[in-house]
Every structure is written in structure tokens, then in C-alpha cells.
Amino acid sequence: MSHEGEEELLDYSDSEEIALPSTTVESGSNGDAKAETTTVKEENTEQKGSYVGIHSTGFRDFLLKPELLRAIVDCGFEHPSEVQQVCIPQSILGTDVLCQAKAGVGKTAVFVLSTLQQLEPVPGECSVVVLCHTRELAYQIMNEYARFSKYLPDVKTAVFYGGSPIQKDIELIQNKETSPHVIVATPGRLHALVRDKHLRLGNVKTFVIDECDKVLDQIDMRRDVQEIFRVTPRQKQVMMFSATLSQEIRPICKKFMSSPLEILVDDEGKLTLHGLQQYYVDVEEKSKNRKLGDLLDNLEFNQVIIFVKSTSRANGLSQVLNANGFPCTAVHSGIPQEERIARYKEFKEFKKRICVSTDVFGRGIDIERINLAINYDLPAEADQYLHRVGRAGRFGTKGLAISFVSTPEDKEVLAKIQERFEVNIAPYPAEGVDPSTYMNS
């Protein structure tokens, strides 16, 4: 990488929010009903396929539909993760579930498999609603439904989000041949469809919110969720999932539920992303580009995601990288929706190996080839660090996370991360890192 002029990137504020701090689950209740809390420690694990398995438990033990088991085999999954072992047996029985588990342990598969297991498709009736906070995550969840419903040809799934023509959504809903049984959506667009009487949700049996803390923390989104929730039947299953749940958000989640099973996988106070190597680099702001180029030149990686703190810095850094022989794409909230989805697909399909992003890509996005995450700008809060570095080393695979530390504020955040998650983040070694420690063989 050439380094003509070590220019600092211009910085303008970005509107994306940071995750709230969170705490571990002690107990829970909903009115007078006592809610059960299950804590799972990650012990006696063994590496199996793409998930970390415990003992010899397999997906067949859940007595899933043969069509689902075939799809699971096609995906190459042998053993369920900890969160799947605890959640799936309860969720397929219709139990309300509030689940907090760290990034990369297969939470999405829990609600996808459990809703497909329970689904008996009726033409023209929506049975499952899944809400999430970004278009990219909605698109990804829809793809997970497509993967696991591969051998369930009668099941129809649709994704609705703002920024695309609403008339296309209306036409899809009104056509009985395409009317979905499973709807994945962002709250604003789904509320608009419900409000204007284009969509009826009187037959919904399962209501899911992924990254529920992010959805319910934002007042506008929470209001949309409440309006959607009101038009669904009183008797239904409600499931919510996230990597972080604060003391403030947890009771809000439980207002939507009836005696939920609360599940906490491992000690949320510890950052135990197995196989993820974590380092930091002391570097002046003006030298970040040079250091980043050195890392990209010298490190082996499949795909890398580079996090910055604003849309303007994402644009600026991607231009610098492309100009210096590192083809990359940028994903952030300032890009029109259709273009964002196109860039996400381009990266997921391995057409680009480098992605520069704001925190819009910091939650829930699952791209299996990512094994390197770089915090060009450290997040302002410790919890967002967990979501960011969780993009690498998912599902028990290896990965590497490197954070640039440039200011006194960065040093404070780094200290908070290490204290918050009881993890030691060491200086990046001068001799580099052995690829075998973060590259899967």
C-alpha cells in the first residue's frame, strides 16, 4: 500500500446508536407469574462442524420434521450450539423465550427452526412475524428461512423494509400465490402495511424480535412494535433474542410476554468468544492508514470487516483503500437502501474481501468467511465492542480482532472493555501473529 500523505479522515457525526450497557440475568417475572431463568455454562465442549457441540447431542434429538433435518444436514451442521440445545426444545413447544447469548452462537437458527417446526401453512395467512432493526439483518434472516425451508415448498417467506416501493409489498400480500406465511420486517414498514389495512395479522402464532434491545430501545421503533403487536392474537408465542440486554430494556421486553423462559448462555460478564484472538495497536490518528495498510499486507485473512465511527469516515477510508490496491466496499446508513443490500450481497458472496462499515454492520450480520475484524475507530461503549468483534470467529471458528487506540478516550474504552468482559487485550506483537491461531485449517 502506498502512503502518499498520511491524511487524517474527516469526521462528521453519524446517527447510528450504540448498544446500551447490559447486566446478567438473576431472576424474572411477568406480573404474578414466576419466570424461569436458565443459565448455561460452556463446559466440556468439543468442536463439531460449524457449531460448538456439547457431548453427543444432535439436532435429531429435537424430533424436528424430516424436511428440517435434511436442510440442516445440507448446511453442514452436526451438533447444536449451547443456546440451541437449551432454547429449541422449549421454543418448539410454544414457550415464550427471552434469550441473551453472545454473538455468533446460532440464535437466529433457534427461532427459524422452531417456527418452521410449528408452522402449518394456510394459504393467505401469516403465521410468523419476525422484527429486526436493520434492512440488512432482515434480508439475512429471510435467507436463513430460505435455507432451512428448502424442503418445505409450501412455506412462503417475505421480507419487508423501508426504502423499497411499498406497492410491491402490497401486491405480494394480496396475491394468494405469493402471500407469505412468514414475514421478516423492520417495524416501520410493517406498521405502515398494517395501519393502512393492507396486511392482517389475526392468525399470527409466533411473534419474534431479533436484537430486541436495539429495537425496543428506540422510541419510534418501540411504538411501531406496540401497534403491530396489538393487531395480533392475544394467545401467541413471543420470542426475543439479543447479545446484550440492559436492566432498563429487560422489563420492557417482558411486558410483551407471558411467564417467559429466560435463557442466559454462559456468563455475559465475560467475553468468551472461543477461538478469537484480540489485540490492540497504539497508533496516532494520522498514522492509522499506514498501519492499516501494513496489517492488510501482512495478515492472512478470508474476509475482513473494518469498523469506523461515522459515514464520512467509512466513505473516506474505502476511497483510500481502493486507491491503494485494496478493493473494498463500504456499508453504512448514508447509502440508499437498494445499494446497501447490493453491497451486502457482494461482500457475502465473496466478490469483495474487505468491507468498511459503521455500526450498522455491527450487530447480527453473519458472514461465515469473516475471520478478521479491525476497529479503525474504537466504539464509544464497551458493549458495542462485543457486537463488532463478534463478526469474526463465529460459530466456534477462529478469528482475529485488532483495535486501534489513538486518544485518551480510546484508552479509557479499552480499559472498560477489559474490565467489563474480564478479558486481557494485549498489544499487537511486533513479530505479528501466527496465522494458525486465527485461520481455520
Swiss-Prot record:
Catalytic reaction equation(s): ATP + H2O = ADP + phosphate + H(+)
Top EC class for this record: hydrolase
Highest rank taxon of the organism: Eukaryota
Region (Disordered): 1-47
Cystine pairings recorded for this chain: none
Keyword field: ATP-binding, Helicase, Hydrolase, mRNA processing, mRNA splicing, mRNA transport, Nucleotide-binding, Nucleus, RNA-binding, Spliceosome, Transport
Enzyme nomenclature, EC number: 3.6.4.13
Keyword Ribosomal protein found: no
GO process terms (BP): mRNA 3'-end processing; mRNA export from nucleus; mRNA splicing, via spliceosome; subtelomeric heterochromatin formation; transcription elongation by RNA polymerase II; transcription-coupled nucleotide-excision repair
Comp. bias (Acidic residues): 1-17
Positions of short motif Q motif: 57-85
Residues in Helicase C-terminal domain copies: 275-436
Skewed-composition ranges (Basic and acidic residues): 33-46
A cellular component annotation (GO) from this entry: transcription export complex
Pfam families: DEAD, Helicase_C
Compartment(s) where it occurs, according to its Swiss-Prot or TrEMBL record: Nucleus
UniProt cross-references to InterPro entries, sorted A to Z: DEAD/DEAH_box_helicase_dom, Helicase_ATP-bd, Helicase_C-like, P-loop_NTPase, RNA_helicase_DEAD_Q_motif
SUPFAM superfamilies: P-loop containing nucleoside triphosphate hydrolases
Free-text note regarding domains: The Q motif is unique to and characteristic of the DEAD box family of RNA helicases and controls ATP binding and hydrolysis.
Described purpose of this protein according to its UniProt entry: ATP-binding RNA helicase involved in transcription elongation and required for the export of mRNA out of the nucleus. SUB2 also plays a role in pre-mRNA splicing and spliceosome assembly. May be involved in rDNA and telomeric silencing, and maintenance of genome integrity.
Family per similarity comment: Belongs to the DEAD box helicase family. DECD subfamily.
Descriptive protein name: ATP-dependent RNA helicase SUB2
Taxonomic lineage from the root: Eukaryota, Fungi, Dikarya, Ascomycota, Saccharomycotina
